[in-house]
């Protein structure tokens, strides 16, 4: 019996160690901001940011394409495993938006003198990033807000967050996961429908059959298509793309 408990203790300890290493080396990414066309703002500003466990690399294809089209692009890579969604937004997203709004206001004053139309700020965000921008826009009003594009958004949560295992592993996967449960009282389901120009893009193909087994209905490997929808926001399915491969398709950029 003692031998059994020793083995069990070793297994539990090893599991915790593995989970801790996964969190530190695979799920945790540093805060950084990347600018495109920063000193040559002749078109609108587009702010982009990732979803949970994501990096700026995932949005690089979109960022570079938009920059090639002349937009001033600002990508925010932020840590996603330490805070809840509201805290992440206030800590990492708000300061950059404030920075860009201040810059845009100055530019628009100069353009007004020249009788040029005002420039706007748009947002292109992936997955959980949609929850951050919806929370931000619920709490703040932007006078020069343009288009908001939500890619693969868990607009009404995901069954993956409902799984009891997610509650047990909250320390390792991050407290923000609980914000994306599908029950009506969850954080994401308290954000309401957008009152601004908002579009939803989502894939229709899964590359993770284990996750798909936990999700009801058609999904993109992470998010159910049915719960991505938002009232009043047009939805476009990008065919043959998954939760992440959708970010590397020219069709996605064309829809933005």
Predicted regions and their residues:
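N-terminal Sec-pathway targeting helices
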Residues: 1-17
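Membrane-interface motif at the C-terminal end of an N-terminal transmembrane signal
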Residues: 16-34
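Proline/glycine-enriched tight loop/beta-turn segments at coil->beta junctions
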Residues: 38-45
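Serine-dependent carboxylesterase/thioesterase catalytic core
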Residues: 47-50, 57, 66, 73-76, ...
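The serine-hydrolase catalytic nucleophile loop
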Residues: 55-61
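Short aromatic-enriched loop/helix-cap "lid" or pocket-rim segments at secondary-structure transitions
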Residues: 60, 87-88, 158-164, 209-214, ...
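Histidine-bearing beta->alpha loop at or near hydrolase active sites
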Residues: 78-83, 240-244
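C-terminal catalytic-base region of ester-bond hydrolases, centering on the histidine
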Residues: 193-256
